[in-house]
Regions:
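Conserved beta-strand-loop-alpha-helix hinge in the C-terminal portion
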Residues: 226-252
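The feature captures the beta-strand-to-loop junction immediately N-terminal to the Walker
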Residues: 38-40
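ABC ATPase C-loop
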Residues: 162-163
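Conserved ABC transporter NBD signature motif
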Residues: 61-69, 229-231
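H-loop/switch region of ABC-family ATPase nucleotide-binding domains
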Residues: 206-207
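A short, flexible loop at the N-terminus of ABC-type nucleotide-binding domains that lies
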Residues: 1, 10-24, 74
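ABC ATPase NBD coupling module
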Residues: 70-83, 91, 113-116, 120, ...
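Helix-to-loop junction immediately C-terminal to a conserved catalytic motif
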Residues: 53
């Protein structure tokens, strides 16, 4: 599970560039819950992800993962509990290494180091079984350099690596935004399958409102560092893009930008 209690973070405090990135944010995710997060640029979505991952430390408030306070925990230690996929397909893999070597690194996370060299046949078979679920033919290309894969293939591999050890929290940071529409749809479908299969507690940030509506069990909308809308269950299922935009206007008394970056 994941919990944020009264989390606030201000950048450039006391200067002309002061910005309240997060303001008294409270979130509680139960085990297996899938939360999608939307909002325009500067709403606080990325800062929220960084505070959870540990790459940004809040000024006030606390972050809990599996009922353990992790706010003072260094990012590299916190990463043992978190799987994260970034927007850039190049960010989650080592391009100069093979598919097999990348998977071996992901597999070794949270496990005791041994002196055994290479990858055992049993583990190689396991890697192939996991790759088969992607339906991209990567199970037959274990020796291929990851740098030679397409963006969609690399992002699918990143997603697989992030979920290999079934992390306490899976964070998806606009992980389909850099892909063409067909590959974005593929990665979206793979995401849905993996999250449901392993019942992963998931937080997904997206600019694509339709994606936020189609995926997940709960949705929050952020604006100016605050959560201004939080819906789940039947209420979320009945939402449309038009209703979301109208709700933003009702809450904020202003019109949300109606551009491609927001509507996807």
């Amino acid at each position: 599970m994941l919990r944020l209690d009264q989390v606030s973070l201000t950048f450039n405090e006391g200067t002309m560039d002061e910005k309240n990135a997060l303001q008294d944010v409270n979130i509680e995710l139960e085990s297996g819950e899938f939360l999608t997060v939307i909002g325009s640029n500067g709403a606080g979505k990325s800062t929220l992800m960084n505070v959870i991952s540990g790459s940004a430390i809040p000024d006030t408030g606390n972050v809990f993962i599996d009922n353990k306070a992790v706010t003072p925990m260094q990012e590299y230690k916190r990463s043992q509990m978190i799987g994260r996929v970034f927007q850039d397909p190049m960010a989650g893999t080592a391009p100069s290494m093979t598919i097999e070597e990348n998977l071996a690194l992901a597999w070794a996370r949270n496990k005791k180091r041994t002196l055994k060299p290479g990858v055992s046949k049993k583990r190689k078979n396991l890697f192939q079984e996991h790759l088969e679920t992607l339906n991209l033919g990567l199970e037959d290309r274990l020796s291929a350099k990851v740098g030679l894969l397409s963006g969609g293939e690399r992002q699918a591999l990143s997603l697989l690596m992030a979920t290999f050890t079934e992390p306490s929290i899976l964070m998806l940071d606009e992980h389909t935004a850099a892909l063409d529409p067909s590959r974005a749809e593929l990665i979206t479908n793979i995401t849905d399958e993996i999250v449901k299969k392993f019942q992963l507690t998931t937080l997904m940030v997206t600019h694509n409102m339709q994606q936020a509506l189609d995926l997940g069990t709960r949705l929050i909308m952020m604006d100016k560092g605050q959560i201004i809308l939080d819906v789940a269950g039947e209420e979320k299922q009945n939402l449309t893009i038009e209703k979301l935009l109208n709700e933003f206007q009702r809450i904020r008394g202003e019109q949300m930008a109606n551009d491609k970056a927001v509507l996807g």
